[in-house]
Amino acid sequence: MTSAPPDTSELSARLSEHMNGYLYTACLYTVTKAGVADHLADGPRTAAELAEKTGLNGPHLHRVLRYLATREVFHEDEQARFALTPMAELLRTDTPGSLHDPFLMLGEDLYWKPLARMYDTVRQGRTAFDD
């Protein structure tokens, strides 16, 4: 008698979530650098309105905001307007305890490029920051 294979769907979903961590960070960096949270301080706006204020491409910004809305960073209403959530408040520049500046720092090449070379770092036993 053979036993049924274990159900790995939950583990697969959790691991996939971790796999997409870089995407989440890149989206947070993008909206932080553009000042989206500051532009939403006065109330909800569409991605097109935010694109006009930030200089970003509207359809691409809309995709980023929708992704972040699935993570409860922003809220999207029935009119496709985006609003701040308590989490997004921490991306504003004028919020006490803001994470605005740390997100900007972590999104810069100084940090991203060495992370992309982590395999070589571990294989060679030296830091990628030297490259």
Tell what function each PLM region has:
Residues 2-55, 59-131:
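Conserved Class I S-adenosyl-L-methionine-dependent methyltransferase catalytic core
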